[in-house]
Amino acid sequence: MTKKTQVGLIFGGNSSEYEVSITSAGNIYKAIDKDKFDVHPIWITNSGYVASEADSYKVLEEPGYMVEKNDKTANLSNLIELASRPELDVLFPIVHGNLGEDGVLQGLFRLIDKPFVGVDVLAAAVTMDKEFTKILAQRAGVPVAKWVSIKRYEYEDAKNQKLSYDWVSGQLGTSNLFVKPSNQGSSVGITHVTDDSNYAEALAEAFKYDDKVLVEEGIVGTEVETAVLGNDHPVVSGVGQIINADNTWYSYENKYSTESTTTLQIPAQIPAETAEKVQENALKIYQITECSGMARVDSMLRESDGEVIFNELNALPGFTNISMYPKLFEEAGISYPDLITRLIRLAEERYAHKKTLLRKHD
């Protein structure tokens, strides 16, 4: 009988995307092929404590469950103890947001010498920062929305021209703007701004989450997403379409609320040549950012000329019931359990390859 792979499923975290992580982890736990894998849930509470395995199972069953008492050793440093758990063959982090998909956890996994699902340290750090991702996309020849970057020291300078809506909208050539933290996901901290009335408030909201804020031109058109899977030879899924109600956008509420007015269309109702361009751009960005394992790439089809404009890359896409990433591969014939299996095998393949690299000069 083939020995099962022991998987450490890490989820939760002290992050604005905590609830998304819990939901994603629950879905992965339900869908994973239990004939091939034994799952060991590892819950990081929203207070930053690492819960026991018993409590970790409990929160997957009851997402609102809270640990009644944290013992004195229950803190984030417990993750280093993963190194002394030889029964764990591979780690599957589904910790969204800061500390989870920005290279921090990935660096820890490298230190403790464990294979892990998803992008490696460099790609995690780069793709968490929307500005750096846009710069690399431009380098790859992919069009991006125009933007102005504001650092905290600039924000704290009352005389800085970037604090003026009129100046920024003039630079970007439009009154239709999105103000967003550069390092954040799930549309957290993003505000749609169309005049001076809420620009200052939008900046204040975004700076709650990051020390760098982007003000981007709003692209009028169709929002589409595609999924990428693989290491050196990735495959790109078909294209899905985000259909928002009139005068709305794909906000956090529209992504995750039960009252969402947004629907997903798979496949997207767009011309074949446009879909091919979306896929081509997604692959270019995936490769130039040195992603591996998985990513979801979001784009806009500009209404005025049909140009495919890169929006952002999510290196740890959601696995909720309404998440586009697993749905796109399901449409391509890869079931949810098979997708999870492939992600784990990709992690093992990357780890095995890195073991062949020399660490010192002979």
From Swiss-Prot:
GO terms for biological process: cell wall organization; peptidoglycan biosynthetic process; regulation of cell shape. Residues 134-345 form the ATP-grasp domain. Its main location: cytoplasm. It is found in: Cytoplasm. It catalyses: 2 D-alanine + ATP = D-alanyl-D-alanine + ADP + phosphate + H(+). Gene3D superfamilies: 3.40.50.20, ATP-grasp fold, A domain (3.30.1490.20), ATP-grasp fold, B domain (3.30.470.20). The keyword ATP-binding applies. One of its GO terms (molecular function) is metal ion binding. The keyword Transmembrane helix does not apply. One of its GO terms (cellular component) is cytosol. Mg(2+) 2 binds at residues 312, 314. InterPro entries: ATP-grasp, ATP_grasp_subdomain_1, D-Ala_lig_Van_CS, D_ala_D_ala, Dala_Dala_lig_C, Dala_Dala_lig_N, PreATP-grasp_dom_sf. It comes from the Bacteria. It is an enzyme of class 6 (ligase). Binds 2 magnesium or manganese ions per subunit. Mg(2+) 1 binds at residues 298, 312. Belongs to the D-alanine--D-alanine ligase family. This is D-alanine--D-alanine ligase. It comes from Lactobacillus delbrueckii subsp. bulgaricus (strain ATCC 11842 / DSM 20081 / BCRC 10696 / JCM 1002 / NBRC 13953 / NCIMB 11778 / NCTC 12712 / WDCM 00102 / Lb 14). The lineage of its organism: Bacteria, Bacillati, Bacillota, Bacilli, Lactobacillales.
